[in-house]
Swiss-Prot record:
One of its GO terms (molecular function) is serine-type endopeptidase inhibitor activity. It holds the Pfam family Kazal_1. The record marks M16, E17 as: Reactive bond 3. This is Ovomucoid. Transmembrane segments: none annotated. The keyword Iron does not apply. GO terms for cellular component: extracellular region.
């Protein structure tokens, strides 16, 4: 199972770096920062499905 360490999030701004991650909501997040901010917003219900686009 793929995991991402989201300690230290949410961050107020994310870079435009593109390293896609696919969330358990079947949505592609542009990078770890965007994904981790969404994880925090979801109160931990969002998880990583896999690295790369959905």
């Amino acid at each position: 199972v793929a995991t991402v360490n989201c300690s230290g999030y949410p961050k107020p701004a994310c870079t435009m770096e593109y390293m896609p991650l696919c969330g358990s909501d079947n949505k592609t997040y542009g990078n770890k920062c965007n994904f981790c901010n969404a994880v925090v917003d979801s109160n931990g219900t969002l998880t990583l499905s896999h690295f790369g686009e959905c």
